[in-house]
Design a protein with these regions (language model features):
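Low-complexity, intrinsically disordered or signal/transmembrane-proximal segments
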Residues: 8-9, 21, 33, 44
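Cap/insert and terminal regions of metallo-dependent hydrolase folds
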Residues: 236, 243-245, 253-345
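Histidine (H) residue identity feature
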Residues: 8-9, 138-143, 228-230, 270, ...
């Protein structure tokens, strides 16, 4: 009898413990949900884990418009190089002006970063299907790899097809992309999927030469030749708006033309090679980079001549040297403001 009574009471005790534990878990879950609801609106970066986007949105086709009263801004979508990097997408900069986004180069990872920047800075124009235009400095893969993602991500929701500007060869590249993506277009338009704009996949490619290549509502974009070794043509861009002058180098060795275009610029975005890192490479790679890219000392001399208000280093090759070393190398010669860009920086 005593054994039965003991077993009965022990069973009741275990059940009670389970009920208490379940209640505690439910309360904890509710508190966590309430906490997350308060801290992270849809699409915002999760505060506890900045790499997690808590609510990717399917933007409406005619969604919110970027505030046209904002001053001219540049968002760094890619500060990296051809070398895969978990922290840096390949080269890409986004100009935000009068409610539109204009991309300059579109290396691998740039479009995912554009989506992050759209929500981080509340810039609807950076949602991929809202980006109107892209300007390419040259056709190396680390400057063009995300062109297909830009043109074809949710293409059916574009109001208009993408406008692309760049050097000779761009038209052939966009035709090849259209052929590559033809099965996707056929599958989406051949069934019952709603396609608000069945021609939204079309890319209008303009092969440019030196001079003004785009003007709209006070925005002037000028292309100029740069010296990227045997890659010809290769362009830099000078952007002029009512409130800013911005110069983008693209890939280039020291360029007198670029130095002239950058005189008095508000911001000069320039590629750079760390001399400390380059010294450890083979003579063949040293010869190549000296002929096609700008070393830190040459960039400092260019900045000393042009005197931009702000020099932003992007597309930096460090070759094992600490990243800040290249900043020190520039500052040893030029005493102006120097910033080493990171992905999603905004200026």
């Amino acid at each position: 009898m005593s054994i039965r009574i003991f077993a009965h009471h022990w069973t009741k005790f275990i059940l009670a413990c389970c009920i208490v534990q379940l209640g505690a878990c439910s309360a904890s879950t509710a508190n966590l949900q309430n906490s997350n609801a308060g801290n992270n609106a849809p699409g915002q970066i999760n505060g506890a884990n900045p790499s997690v986007v808590t609510g990717a949105r399917n933007e409406p086709r005619n969604g919110p418009v970027t505030d046209i009263s904002r001053p001219t801004q540049i968002v760094v979508l890619g500060s990296g190089t051809p070398i895969p990097d978990a922290k840096r997408a390949s080269a890409s900069l986004a100009l935000i002006y009068q409610g539109e986004a204009y991309l300059f180069d579109v290396g691998a990872g740039a479009i995912r970063n554009a989506t992050k920047a759209r929500y981080r800075y509340d810039i609807p124009a950076l949602y991929p299907s809202q980006i109107c235009c892209v300007f390419l400095t040259h056709l190396h893969s680390d400057h063009t790899m995300d062109l297909v993602e830009l043109a074809y991500t949710m293409w059916w929701r574009r109001r208009d097809g993408l406008l692309a500007f760049g050097p000779d060869g761009l038209a052939g590249m966009t035709r090849a992309l259209a052929q590559f993506m033809a099965p996707d277009v056929s599958l989406r338009t051949g069934g019952n999927q709603p396609t608000p704009n069945p021609l939204g996949y079309r890319v209008s490619a303009t092969e440019i030469s030196e001079g003004i290549v785009f003007e709209k509502d006070g925005l002037i974009i000028e292309a100029f030749d740069v010296n990227h070794g045997h890659v010809k043509p290769a362009y830099g861009y000078k952007i002029t708006t009512p409130d800013k002058v911005i110069v983008i180098s693209g890939d280039t060795a020291y360029s007198e033309i670029l130095a002239q275009k950058a005189v008095g610029a508000d911001i000069l975005f320039h590629e750079v090679v760390s001399e400390a890192g380059l010294g450890g490479r083979s003579i063949f790679w040293q010869n190549y980079h000296n002929s096609a890219h700008t070393t830190s000392s040459n960039l400092a001399k260019l900045a000393r001549s042009a005197k931009p208000a702000k020099l932003v280093l992007y597309h930096g090759l460090h070759f094992g040297a600490p990243e800040q070393k290249v900043v020190e190398e520039v500052r040893a010669i030029w005493d102006g403001e120097v910033i080493l860009a990171n992905d999603l920086d905004i200026f």
